[in-house]
């Protein structure tokens, strides 16, 4: 049997932290992608080609991680709603 010791509000606060983390990761990737363009304009050769290939290979994984954090946010919000509704349902049964 599972046990959740967090209140719905605490779960919502945690969910928001995941959204904040996702946005931070997206912001960093945007800045680094812009910087990559600057480097691209000023560095020619096979060394840069390898550098750019590595960056381009990893960028989608970073984007996927940011999306995963958003997905976790949504899951936590749903859990908070379920906990809140379950508590309300139990309370209404006791008060009958």
From Swiss-Prot:
Coiled-coil parts of chain: none
Family classification: Belongs to the WXG100 family. sagEsxA-like subfamily.
Subunit structure: Homodimer.
NCBIfam families attached to this UniProt entry: WXG100_ESAT6
Protein name (Swiss-Prot/TrEMBL): ESAT-6-like protein SAG0230
């Amino acid at each position: 049997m599972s046990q959740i010791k967090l209140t719905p509000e605490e779960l919502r606060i945690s969910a928001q932290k995941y959204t904040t983390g996702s946005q931070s990761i997206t912001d960093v990737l945007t800045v680094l992608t812009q910087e990559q363009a600057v480097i691209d304009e000023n560095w020619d050769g096979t060394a840069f080609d390898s550098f750019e290939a590595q960056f381009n290979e990893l960028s989608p994984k970073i984007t996927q991680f940011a999306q995963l954090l958003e997905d976790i946010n949504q899951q936590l919000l749903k859990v908070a709603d379920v906990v809140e509704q379950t508590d309300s349902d139990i309370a209404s049964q006791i008060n009958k």
